[in-house]
């Protein structure tokens, strides 16, 4: 059995180690974030007008070519996608068109950002961008495309997204 002062010293040392590990794990668990605005490029004005809203999903997959795999899995309805970092609610197309989409706080690092233009809650256009997000924030732009198996929606008489958003079309 240890004398009382020696037991107290060991206990204090043990508490110091446990406390230090707690601080280390807390620091490692907290990820730095930065503010980014997410935007899309539609293949045509007609396809932008045909879309109701855009959903963005941020995946944690820093491997090269991740977006191609994520895109193919999405359009073929496969479920084994990488871990999701952020899955905010969809943004109306008119909000994006007029710059009213709110910036999002995204974790710093390499991610894949999938954008899905929805029409009647169904995938219409899909795109993905592999990005390295830095502390400076900024804008991430994703090019959208019509997956091969998706039927074309009926075309609007509108000539601009602004007219469609302001209900100026017949």
Where do the language-model regions lie?
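Residue-level signal for mature regions of secreted extracellular proteins and peptides
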Residues: 21, 59-61, 87, 121-122, ...
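Short amphipathic, basic-aromatic surface patches that mediate peripheral association
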Residues: 39-48
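Short coil-to-beta strand junction motifs in C2/discoidin
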Residues: 49-54
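Compositionally biased low-complexity segments at domain edges in trafficked proteins
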Residues: 139-170
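Bacterial N-terminal signal peptides that target proteins for export
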Residues: 2-18
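Bacterial signal peptide processing site
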Residues: 29-31
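C-terminal motif of bacterial Sec signal peptides marking the signal peptidase cleavage site
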Residues: 25-27
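Tryptophan-paired
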Residues: 57-136
């Amino acid at each position: 059995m240890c004398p009382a002062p020696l037991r107290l010293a060991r206990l204090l040392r043990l508490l110091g180690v446990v406390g230090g590990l707690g601080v280390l794990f807390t620091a490692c668990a907290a990820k730095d974030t930065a503010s980014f605005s997410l935007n899309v490029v539609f293949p045509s004005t007609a396809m932008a007008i045909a879309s109701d809203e855009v959903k963005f999903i941020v995946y944690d997959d820093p491997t090269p070519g991740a977006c191609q795999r994520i895109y193919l899995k999405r359009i073929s309805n496969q479920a084994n996608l990488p871990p999701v970092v952020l899955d905010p609610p969809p943004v109306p197309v008119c909000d994006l068109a007029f710059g009213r989409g709110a910036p999002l706080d995204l974790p710093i690092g390499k991610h894949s950002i999938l954008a899905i233009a929805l029409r009647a809650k169904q995938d219409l256009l899909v795109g993905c961008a592999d990005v390295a997000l830095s502390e400076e924030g900024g804008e991430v732009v994703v090019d959208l495309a019509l997956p091969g198996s998706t039927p074309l929606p009926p075309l609007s008489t509108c000539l601009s997204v602004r007219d469609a958003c302001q209900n100026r079309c017949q």
